[in-house]
A protein has these predicted regions:
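Conserved segment of the helicase C-terminal RecA-like domain
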Residues: 698-727
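Inter-Walker segment of RecA-like/P-loop motor cores
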Residues: 370-411
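Interdomain helical connector at the RecA1-RecA2 junction of SF1/SF2 helicase-like NTPases
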Residues: 246-255, 486-590, 607, 611
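Post-DEXD/H (motif II) to motif III coupling segment of the RecA-like Helicase ATP-binding lobe
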Residues: 434-523
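Catalytic cores and motor modules of nucleic-acid processing enzymes
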Residues: 25-27, 37, 54-59, 63-76, ...
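Conserved RecA-like ASCE ATPase "motif II neighborhood" in helicase/translocase motors
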Residues: 396-428, 432-443, 457-466, 644-652, ...
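Conserved C-terminal RecA-like helicase domain
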Residues: 556-663
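ATP-dependent helicase/translocase motor core
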Residues: 2-351, 360, 364-375, 404, ...
Length: 1000
């Protein structure tokens, strides 16, 4: 008999591992086998799918067996042996409680029905408690194959379902790579075939739904159809995604052999899984969220508890977990469980100190503790010397403090409480911003301008540690995504290598793995320094294929502090956000932007400039400014609250509500701020080292509708950012600037293979954008596939497909940042996005996922349509109604402000070495304005048309005047012709001088 490599074979293998009954058949219906002794893996009971009651989502046989063994009097009280109204009332009560409270709370606390208290689960026994151990052994952990769960779609079946005492806790969809299906297919099956309206899939009825193949594991806590969000549950391999090879079996067997054992699952239910409620302060609406730990969170907490239980107080631990990896929950779970940790039958720690400045962590600790104890009796906030002693006397086990108050706590620990044992959890990678921040510290940072030697919270903690030495009666648990050298030396694990003593983290979850797993987004993929932006724009003048209208769109690099520079950069940011983010429906239209500035003065300037320009655009959106303390601006004392019109503490909540879309920051919210709706960042501040990583990482938080992010940087370059990320990311994937000419080269190479012709591209794009049926596209694509198969050898096929993917990837990036369009590129990109999934793959490649993506193109089509139409708003934006006051959108500079304009010119274009600077200045301020003002067409436009048309005629007149200077002043002509930044500045300046002058 050959090996069973089918999906059912994998299912049987898992069940055999869990039950210890090799490929056994279920017991007969209504027959509950006795639980076997919990030895090794043979500790799950094999359930029978026929025992499952679909109406009440319960395995009646297993539930009855548990109650008969533990609370026998309830069998008769609830008439469980008969399908009677009495039994139905009990089952209805049970399911009602699960629907209201969730399976986690029902298992932990049981239910009340009539006069009876019903225990539905016995938790982990304390060591030495024989009776508790006997009760725990009476729990019935069962696994059922091919569970038919639906009353309507009676043939629908889940591959596996896990039950505790007859109550479902988890479901499985299994796939097998040997049959060319993967975990992605399992996820699609959940999204497509598992109706979230089914009772079993309602919120809170199961702790997790697992998609599993022989290589990867994903899970979802709340099925929502296509909106279901599956998170990775993998061990990681080589600091990346996936799982290591397993010499003993499948790569994923850790899930059922180590994680979902009865004791392991019980631990998760008791200490990790939870439902938290968030109340919207404005609407009062409560939102519920179910939490299940990811693998690295479960792994780090369990490893820390094991090691701390063995060594007791006095050890140091460094946990390097990537930004966005869920450190807050990891810290909360660890803090809670350290309370009950024992060493030699005594508490390992008397008190747990948590050092953090993040309100979110404070709340998560409270949410976690709330599941098991009274928060007020367990948690205290230490802000002054003596608070620790007071809380200890009150019996509080967890004390939360800020980094600024931390020295007082350390003094108490080292002096008054040297005989007690402490665990100190430090969330030290997050500067004190956005939560209970120290205004004095933040203001000092703002004044310093965030240089590389800026003292972050991590530095402060290190300095405090150095000053007071590490206390022998305390263990330190330091969590960070970006450990500095001092942090590694203070908290890392020492290990010898050669004649050196090195240090490493106790546990790590790398940025690379988080990105590979799709849990955070790669902020380096679309990082664009403005210098590169300019280089890209500059290359178009010699390339006739480009759309010159887009090339004329203004984009300048203004880094000076005067209002004119801020205004122009603000326009660039606002225009980009509207046209490249909102217009493309990023994050389902919910995208937000962060503007990172170098100080409070600059932030306030941006706030006013962005606010004013949003009004001029008639945009419905608004901006929020964030800085600490009070600032003198224009002779008036202002705060963020006075400018925003609401309290500072409301900023995190307001930015996710419309109409707010821009968050303008001065050394605030740049670290420790977790907001998945942040999509775009505009940086006008020098960044380097850890600060650069922490700042850009604000964008990386995942969201079900978030597929990319964008950074536009006015001050830093790719090499600086690369060096900043390298220590914390094993593989540097940020490339140098992308040359748009590569698209010409790729297109030429693809065209040369003659797999398609221009008419096929035109035809498919026209059909697609016209909304035709899908079957009208296939004949065109299939003809190209036939040409690909028949006319190209294998090497040519590999080369063609590789270049096609490169074109799609490169254009997808460049298309969002170039301020001009190329219709042939856009059309080829649309065409290749359909063609590539149809091209035969190498034998080892499975394109089933690609084919499914090619069919379901709704969101992508919307983006592509918007991308192709993005030039239309440009044209429309230039057409304004004739203003009733005869003016334009803003008052142009008056002649008496010419010195300011010239100073801006000299500052910005100081690199131009004029042979005769005085003569050039005279030409710009006198000769050229006089000649342009005398132009007849320009005079007519000023008198008889609007400002928009007057500007058009002005630019034509200026061009004629400059051409006339070619013989007499080649220097000025050359700058005007070769330097588009100077050309635009000169046009703005001359128009400002001449427009308000009376016509001759």
């Amino acid at each position: 008999m050959t090996t069973d490599v089918s999906e059912r074979g994998l299912e049987a293998l898992i069940v055999a591992d869990m039950t210890g009954l090799p490929l056994a058949s279920p017991a007969g219906p209504g027959m509950a086998e006795e639980p076997e002794p919990f030895i090794g893996l043979h500790n799950w009971i094999l359930g029978n799918p026929q025992d499952y009651d679909r109406a009440y989502t319960v395995d009646l046989v297993q539930l009855r067996a548990f109650l008969a063994a533990t609370q026998e009097h309830l069998i008769q009280a609830f008439d469980l042996d008969h399908d009677s109204p009495t039994r139905q009332k009990f089952l209805a009560r049970l399911q009602g409680e699960i629907g209201k409270r969730g399976i986690i709370d029902v298992l932990r606390n049981g239910i009340k029905h009539g006069a009876h208290d019903v225990t539905l689960f016995y938790g982990t026994p304390t060591p030495g408690n024989v009776k508790a151990a006997e009760r725990f052994a009476q729990n019935r952990f069962s696994v059922t194959r091919q569970l038919r769960y639906s009353r309507d779609e009676t043939a629908n079946a889940l591959d596996l379902a896990l039950f505790i005492n007859g109550l479902p806790v988890a479901t499985f969809e299994l796939k097998n790579s040997l049959t060319k299906q993967t975990v992605e297919d399992a996820i699609e099956q959940y999204k497509r075939d598992r109706d979230p309206r089914e009772k079993l899939f309602e919120f809170g009825r199961c702790v997790a739904h697992f998609a599993v193949d022989d290589a990867e594991v994903r899970f979802c806590t709340h099925l929502k159809g296509k909106a279901s969000w599956f998170l990775p549950f993998n061990q990681g391999w080589n600091d990346g995604a996936g799982n290591p090879p397993n010499p003993q079996g499948l790569k994923t067997d850790y899930l059922w052999k180590r994680i979902l054992t009865p004791t392991g699952l019980t631990d998760i239910l008791e200490n990790y899984a939870q439902i938290v409620e968030r109340k919207d302060p404005k609407t009062g609406k409560v939102k519920r969220e179910q939490i299940f730990p990811r693998y690295h969170q479960l792994d780090v907490v369990r490893r820390l508890l094991t090691d701390a239980g063995h060594h007791g107080a006095g050890k140091r631990y460094l946990i390097q977990h990537s930004a966005g990896s869920g450190k807050s929950n990891s810290i909360a779970w660890l803090a809670h469980q350290l309370i009950g940790l024992k060493k030699d039958e005594e508490p390992a720690f008397d008190s747990i100190i948590v050092v953090t400045d993040r309100r979110i962590l404070d709340q998560q600790i409270r949410d976690t503790i709330k599941q098991f104890a009274q928060v007020g009796a367990t948690v205290g906030h230490a802000e002054h010397s003596g608070d620790l002693r007071r809380f200890i006397e009150q019996g509080k086990k967890i004390v939360i403090t800020t980094v600024q108050k931390f020295p007082f706590i350390l003094d108490d620990i080292g002096n008054q409480h040297r005989n007690r044992r402490f665990a100190i959890l430090i969330d030290e990678a997050h500067s004190s911003q956005g939560g209970k921040a120290s205004a004095a510290v933040s203001m000092a940072l703002s004044a310093a301008g965030a240089e590389e030697d800026e003292e972050t919270t991590e530095d402060i903690v290190n300095r405090i540690m150095e000053a007071r030495k590490l206390l022998p009666n305390a263990s330190y648990f330091a969590f960070t995504a970006t450990p500095k050298n001092k942090t590694l030396e203070l908290f890392g694990e020492p290990f010898p290598e050669g004649n050196k003593a090195k240090h490493r983290p106790f546990h790590s979850y790398t940025m690379k793995q988080a990105i590979d797993e799709g849990f955070i987004l790669d902020v380096l993929k679309s990082y664009t320094p403005v210098e590169s932006y300019y280089r890209l724009v500059k290359t178009i003048e010699s390339d006739p294929e480009f759309d010159t209208k887009r090339a004329r769109k203004k984009l300048r690099r203004y880094v000076e502090s005067h209002d004119h520079a801020i205004r122009l950069k603000a326009e660039i940011m606002v225009d980009h956000f509207h046209e490249q983010v909102l217009a493309l429906n990023k994050i389902g239209g919910q995208a937000r932007a962060m503007v990172v500035t170098s100080g409070i003065e600059r932030a306030i300037q941006y706030f006013h400039a962005i606010r004013d320009y949003l009004k001029e655009r008639k945009s419905p959106y608004r901006a929020i400014v964030a800085f600490s303390g009070e600032h003198d601006y224009g002779g008036v004392k202002v705060t963020e609250a006075s400018l925003n019109g609401f309290p500072s503490k409301d900023i995190p909540d307001r930015i996710v509500e419309d109409p707010y879309r821009f968050l303008i920051c001065a050394d605030k919210f740049q670290t420790g701020y977790d907001e998945p709706l942040l999509h775009t960042m505009y940086v006008d501040k020098p960044l380097a080292g850890v600060k650069a990583v922490q700042t850009l990482s604000r964008l990386n938080r995942a969201h079900p509708q978030k597929h990319d992010v964008f950074v536009l940087d006015f001050q830093n370059d790719t090499e600086t950012i690369r060096k900043a990320f390298e220590p914390y990311y094993r593989t540097t994937i940020l490339s140098d600037e992308t040359d748009p000419n590569k698209l010409h080269d790729l297109k030429a190479a693809l065209d040369g293979y003659q797999v398609y012709d221009a008419s096929q591209i035109e035809q498919l794009v026209a059909l697609y954008l016209g909304g035709t049926d899908r079957d009208k596209l296939d004949p065109i694509l299939d003809a190209c596939v036939a040409s690909y198969n028949e006319n190209l050898n294998e090497d040519e096929q590999v080369d063609f497909k590789g270049k096609a993917k490169a074109f799609i990837r490169t254009y997808g990036f460049l298309g969002s940042i170039l301020l001009y369009t190329n219709a042939s590129w856009e059309k080829l990109s649309i065409f290749l996005n359909f063609l590539v999934p149809k091209l035969p793959a190498p034998k080892e490649e499975d394109l089933s996922k690609g084919i499914l993506e090619a069919i379901d193109m709704n969101s992508y089509r919307v983006e592509k349509r918007a991308a192709q139409r993005i030039q239309l708003p440009d044209t429309d934006a230039e057409i304004e109604p004739v203003p009733t006051d005869g003016g334009g959108r803003k008052r142009e500079p008056e002649l008496d402000r010419l010195s300011n304009i010239l100073r801006a010119f000299n500052d910005q274009f100081g690199g131009i070495e004029w042979q005769d600077a005085d003569r050039v200045r005279r030409m710009i301020t006198e000769d050229i304005p006089q000649k342009v003002a005398a132009d007849t067409a320009y005079q007519n436009a000023k008198q008889n048309s609007d400002k928009q048309n007057a500007r058009i005629e002005h630019d034509k007149a200026l061009a004629r005047v400059i051409v006339g200077l070619m013989k007499d002043d080649t220097e000025l002509f050359k700058q005007y012709s070769d330097n588009p930044e100077f050309m635009r500045w000169l046009a703005d300046t001359i128009f400002g001088i001449t427009y308000d002058q009376p016509s001759a």
